[in-house]
Amino acid sequence: MEINKVEQLTDNHNQLLLLADPNQLLVDDYAQRGTVYEATEDETLVGIMVLLPTRPETIELVNIAVVEAHQGKGIAQKMIAFALQTAKQSGFHTIEVGTGSIGFEQLYLYQKCGFRMVAIDRDFFVRHYEEPIIIENGMVLQDMVRLSQDL
């Protein structure tokens, strides 16, 4: 698997970003302000992520998604390891990520990669998404869990 910086977003990139975040306006905003990386296997797109500096020594992993057919193969874990290394080499001291409070697999993955929970942003998904309800694991998604890791 290779991970490389994306210079120009394609429709395939955009569709994969929307898999993790269905708000096109938010995706467009942070993809333009951040750095987008793609993961490929045999020149086929299998994953994507966006890193966005948020404060002088802090960067956030604002989106990470793996093509559904390639999920469960450790791709996201390798991408997160790449993000941690890239952030550290770029001089950042902290990396943050936010995810849905009922995204059990995501919460497990981030903690497995060394992130620790630091806050809950109550009603984040209610405030920022036009869809009346986002259902995940059979529950209505309302809150965002914020996690961070010192580099």
Language-model segments: which ranges?
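Acetyl-CoA-dependent GNAT
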Residues: I3-A69, I80-A81, D150
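Short hydrophobic/aromatic beta-strand or adjacent loop that forms the aromatic wall/cage
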Residues: G34, L141-R146
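Conserved GNAT acetyl-CoA-binding A-motif
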Residues: A87-T99
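Conserved active-site tyrosine of GNAT-family acetyltransferases
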Residues: L109-Y110, F115
